[in-house]
């Protein structure tokens, strides 16, 4: 009886810990295979607004793409990943210079996680006195972590001058970050650093390079509809007319 009671308490404790990853502050959703989407929230125009990131579980640790927008969720995300997969995050890539992508770079660097941005993102963050990555991606690069290969790609300006996408060839997952607008979006969102004239060209280059993705992940809102690239072009057409 004592052993059974201890087991039950341990189970409930573990369930409680992982339950924190779906309490409204941090949501983790399985995408496919070893891919997971994490979503956190911040107030945008007076309303809680979701920001998406991705992590990939490999034999050599977990790769994180972008960091939580909500700064209180930097550690809970690491804890949830460790609890669910019994693996540590070994790498974090931020896809552009805004805080919903780079906010956790310093925190994760202090945790011994290798942090990366492009040279362009690094220089923008440096000029603004914001979080900096430890490692710089000088050009489009293919990484290998564990059994997975993935590619960073800069197609041009759009939501920001430095926005990149990340392509996971084996599973045909295209992580677009804020360069790609969700089908749920009614407008282009934050345009403070945007280049709306170049943005359509950038999207079309991505469509030409990565054909027929199985999954397309935008930086905000719903990510379950693969027509978000076309939707982004439609929003840009409406904005630019």
Role assignments for model-derived ranges:
Residues 1-21:
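Bacterial Sec-dependent N-terminal signal peptides
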Residues 226-241:
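Short, electropositive alpha-helical surface patch
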Residues 42-45, 62, 69-72, 97-102, ...:
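Solvent-exposed loop/turn segments at secondary-structure junctions
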Residues 23-25, 30-31, 61-62, 69-70, 116-157, 160-230, ...:
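Metallo-beta-lactamase
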Residues 59-61, 72-116:
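Active-site metal-binding motif and surrounding structural segment of the metallo-beta-lactamase
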């Amino acid at each position: 009886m004592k052993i059974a009671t201890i087991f039950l308490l341990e189970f409930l404790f573990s369930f409680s810990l992982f339950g924190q990853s779906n309490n409204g502050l941090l949501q983790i959703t399985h995408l496919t295979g070893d891919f997971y989407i994490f979503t956190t929230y911040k107030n945008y125009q007076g309303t809680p607004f979701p920001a998406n990131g991705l992590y990939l579980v490999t034999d050599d640790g977990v790769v994180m793409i972008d960091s939580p927008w909500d700064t209180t969720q930097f550690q809970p995300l690491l804890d949830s990943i460790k609890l669910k997969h019994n693996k540590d995050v070994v790498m974090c890539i931020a896809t552009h210079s805004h805080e919903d992508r780079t906010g956790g770079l310093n925190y994760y660097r202090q945790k011994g996680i290798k942090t990366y941005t492009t040279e362009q993102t690094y220089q923008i963050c440096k000029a603004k006195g914001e979080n900096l990555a430890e490692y710089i991606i000088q050009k489009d690069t293919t990484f290998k972590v564990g059994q997975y290969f993935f590619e960073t790609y800069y197609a041009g300006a759009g939501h920001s001058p430095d926005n990149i996408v990340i392509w996971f060839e084996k599973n045909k997952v295209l992580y677009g970050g804020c360069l790609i607008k969700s089908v749920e979006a009614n407008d282009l969102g934050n345009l403070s650093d945007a280049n709306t004239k170049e943005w359509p060209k950038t999207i079309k280059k991505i469509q030409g390079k990565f054909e027929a993705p199985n999954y397309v992940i935008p930086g905000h809102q719903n990510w379950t509809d693969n027509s978000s690239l076309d939707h982004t072009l439609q929003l840009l057409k409406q904005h630019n007319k």
